[in-house]
Amino acid sequence: MKFALPLLLALFMVGCASTKKKPFAAQRMTVRTTAYTHTEAGGVNNAIGSRLRFGGDTFSAASDWSWLPLGTRFRMVENGRTYVIEDYGSALVGRKTIDLYVPSMGEVRKWGVRNVDIEILEWGSKAMSLKLLKPRATRDYIQTMVAELQKTVPPSALAAATL
C-alpha cells in the first residue's frame, strides 16, 4: 500500500506528459507558374484589399483558391523566396497554376511560363477563401471556386472563419 501512492503519481505524470510534435515536413511539388503585375486588371491591391508585395520577406501570389487557398505560404526552391497566396485570377481556375506578382510588364514577359519546385510551408484556409469568395460569386470563375470549396468546407468552419 505504501507504494501505491508513488506509483499512481508516476502513472499520472507519465499520462499527462506532453509529447513533442514532429517538425512540419514541407510538402514539395512541381507547379506551373506565370507572372502578373499591378498594371493589369486588378490594380495594386490583392483580393483581400492589401497592397501586392514584391521584395522583403514575403512576395504576393495568386492561385485557384479551391486548390491553394488564401493564406497558403510556400517557398520556391530555385530562388528561396517565400510567397503567400492572397490573390486569385480567372485564368487560374482549374489549372493548378500559381501566378507570381512582379512589379512590371517587362518582368512578366521575362518570367513567361515556368515549371518550378515549391515547398508548402503552411496551408491556407479553405473556409476563409469560401467566406471571401461567396459574396463575389457573380462571375463564372468565382462560382467555380465557390462550388469546389463548398464540397470540402463544413458550414461550421465557414461560420468560424476569420481573416
PLM region spans:
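Solvent-exposed, well-ordered loop and adjacent helix/strand elements within mature globular domains
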Residues: 17-163
